[in-house]
């Protein structure tokens, strides 16, 4: 028998589609994991189906509640919601594997009684010895030797004090499936032996509980990472048995998403900073930008358009359009896309999103004062077009939230000034001092400085305005100079020119 003839494969479409996201709560959220969540979410929203959120928390040594909370935080930050599952409820509760043991034991009983599971007492040493005696590679693995043990033979093992593992009787046929991403995948008969589903201590293995949960929850489409492709024929073999005993109605469709690669075409490791979702959030990615980039890790809206909204993704997303080729996490491209989305934000929204980054750098207080809020609103338009990451805000804007006597100067910026910097500052101060407070605006400030430095002293703009930029911001790179001077006001601007002039001995 084959997977396509022995038992039905789901034909679910539209609102009948049920996908799942079932992470293990270990470590911090990995961008590859969140990409998987995003693709499942997008497919559910595109079809009108349901997304189930299930927690695979049966590894007591590695699972942690802290990791679970971080995962929830990541999903909420990206606004990836689910229709059924942990934290939401639903008809298939509970949604944590650690709370579903009784369900697994019932399925194990049915599989055993129906003959799909059989007792296996062999030790690793005995398996190797049999392989060696038969002229096979001793590391070849299990040889299905115990499929047909008699009850007397099983009892003899029990009398030795042995406890059996339970193995699935794998069909002696090719196992094929039509991968939604990769097309037809076939594992020839004999590709793998009967495999253990239940440990000798009675504990069910992941290879049992994951497909059983999918079956009991009516999952129709399994969209997951390419690293799990090799386990799919085992799951299909188990599905044959689950359908036989009435636990499942059909085999789900499988789609294996491409690897996310890091630098040097190596799989993006948890040890790589770029793999940590919160690393990107802390640097100043916004949800819209990161969602857009994660979507491009294996999928695209059109061949010539990279910037799109989440709803545009939902409208267009089909897992059949996902490419099987590995996707490389290109940080520069991700940052560029994030900048595109920053520029799409409404100005007041953009300004408020800067606040946590300014607070984290102690640029503003825990509660913005009236003056701080006013300055932020006025300064936001000066930097929105220039930023790729919100985390750039402290470096770009901190000079606007301090005073001349407290402004820090970048040593490299000061040392790079030309010998005529003091003269430029003196001439600028004299010219600006004559501008009435009531007429201190961008046009007049620019006109006065151009007349003094460009026309009067014959300087090129870059050389003329460099000392002024350092004086005003403390840095070589800043928001537009004249606009910054107007925001600071006449007195503060002149005080900053005086301070740098004093540092230069002018």
Swiss-Prot record:
InterPro entries per record: aa-tRNA-synth_I_cd-bd, aa-tRNA-synth_I_codon-bd_sub2, aa_tRNA-synth_I_cd-bd_sf, Glu-tRNA-ligase_bac/mito, Glu-tRNA-synth_I_codon-bd_sub1, Glu/Gln-tRNA-synth, Glu/Gln-tRNA-synth_Ib_cat-dom, Glu_tRNA_lig_a-bdl
GO cellular component, one term: cytosol
Domain of life: Bacteria
Primary location group: cytoplasm
Keyword Aminoacyl-tRNA synthetase: yes
Gene Ontology biological process terms, A to Z: glutamyl-tRNA aminoacylation
Alphabetical list of SUPFAM superfamilies matching this protein: An anticodon-binding domain of class I aminoacyl-tRNA synthetases (SSF48163), Nucleotidylyl transferase (SSF52374)
Subcellular location: Cytoplasm
EC number from the UniProt entry: 6.1.1.17
Keywords linked to the UniProt accession: Aminoacyl-tRNA synthetase, ATP-binding, Cytoplasm, Ligase, Nucleotide-binding, Protein biosynthesis
Coiled coil start-end: none
Binding, ATP: 270
Reaction catalysed by this enzyme: tRNA(Glu) + L-glutamate + ATP = L-glutamyl-tRNA(Glu) + AMP + diphosphate
GO molecular function per UniProt: ATP binding; glutamate-tRNA ligase activity; tRNA binding; zinc ion binding
Motif segment ('HIGH' region): 23-33
Short sequence motif named 'KMSKS' region, residue ranges: 267-271
Function (record text): Catalyzes the attachment of glutamate to tRNA(Glu) in a two-step reaction: glutamate is first activated by ATP to form Glu-AMP and then transferred to the acceptor end of tRNA(Glu).
HAMAP family for the chain: Glu_tRNA_synth_type1 (MF_00022)
Quaternary organization: Monomer.
Cited PANTHER family: GLUTAMATE--TRNA LIGASE, GLUTAMATE--TRNA LIGASE, MITOCHONDRIAL-RELATED
Membership in a protein family: Belongs to the class-I aminoacyl-tRNA synthetase family. Glutamate--tRNA ligase type 1 subfamily.
Xref: NCBIfam families: gltX_bact (TIGR00464)
Name this polypeptide is given: Glutamate--tRNA ligase
Originating species: Clavibacter michiganensis subsp. michiganensis (strain NCPPB 382)
Gene field: gltX
């Amino acid at each position: 028998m084959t997977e396509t003839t022995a038992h039905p494969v789901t034909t679910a479409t539209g609102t009948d589609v049920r996908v799942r996201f079932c992470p293990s709560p270990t470590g911090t959220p990995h961008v590859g994991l969140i990409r998987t969540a995003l693709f499942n979410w997008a497919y559910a929203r595109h079809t009108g189906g349901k997304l189930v959120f299930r927690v695979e928390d049966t590894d007591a040594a590695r699972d942690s509640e802290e990791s679970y909370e971080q995962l929830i935080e990541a999903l909420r930050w990206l606004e990836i919601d689910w229709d059924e599952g942990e934290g939401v409820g639903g008809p298939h509760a509970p949604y944590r594997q650690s709370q579903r043991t009784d369900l697994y034991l019932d399925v194990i009983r049915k599989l055993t009684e129906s003959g799909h599971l059989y007792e296996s007492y062999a030790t690793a040493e005995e398996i190797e010895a049999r392989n060696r005696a038969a002229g096979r590679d001793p590391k070849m693995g299990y040889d299905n030797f115990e499929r047909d043990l008699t009850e007397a033979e099983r009892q003899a093992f029990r009398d030795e004090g042995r406890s059996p593992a339970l193995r699935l009787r794998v069909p002696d046929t090719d196992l094929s499936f039509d991968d939604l991403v990769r097309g037809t995948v076939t594992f020839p008969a004999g590709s793998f032996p009967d495999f253990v589903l239940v440990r000798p201590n009675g504990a069910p293995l992941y290879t049992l509980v994951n497909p059983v949960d999918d079956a009991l929850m009516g999952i129709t489409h399994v969209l997951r990472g390419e690293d799990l492709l090799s386990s799919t024929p085992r799951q299909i073999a188990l599905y044959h048995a689950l359908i036989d005993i009435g636990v499942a109605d059909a085999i789900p469709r499988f789609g294996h998403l491409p690897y996310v690669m890091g630098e040097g075409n190596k799989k993006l490791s948890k040890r790589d900073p770029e793999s940590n979702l919160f690393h990107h959030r802390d640097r100043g990615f916004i949800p819209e930008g990161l969602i857009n980039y994660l979507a491009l890790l294996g999928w695209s809206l059109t061949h010539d358009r990279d910037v799109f909204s989440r709803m545009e993704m939902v409208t267009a997303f089909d897992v059949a359009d996902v490419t099987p080729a590995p996707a490389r996490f290109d940080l520069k491209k991700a940052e560029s896309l994030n900048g595109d989305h920053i520029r799409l934000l409404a100005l007041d929204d953009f300004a408020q999103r800067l606040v946590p980054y300014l607070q984290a750098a102690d640029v503003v207080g825990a509660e913005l004062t009236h003056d701080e809020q006013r300055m932020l609103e006025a300064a936001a338009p000066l930097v929105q077009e220039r930023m790729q990451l919100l985390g750039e805000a402290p470096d770009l804007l901190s000079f606007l939230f301090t005073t001349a006597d407290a402004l820090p100067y970048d040593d490299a910026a000061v040392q790079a000034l030309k010998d005529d910097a003091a003269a430029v500052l003196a001439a600028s101060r004299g010219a600006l001092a004559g501008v009435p407070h009531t007429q201190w605006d961008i046009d007049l400030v620019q006109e006065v400085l151009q007349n003094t430095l460009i026309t009067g002293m014959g300087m090129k703009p870059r050389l003329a305005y460099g000392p002024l930029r350092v004086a005003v911001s403390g840095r070589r790179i800043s928001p537009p100079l004249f606009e910054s001077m107007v925001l600071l006001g006449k007195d503060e601007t002149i005080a900053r020119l005086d301070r740098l002039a004093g540092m230069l001995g002018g």
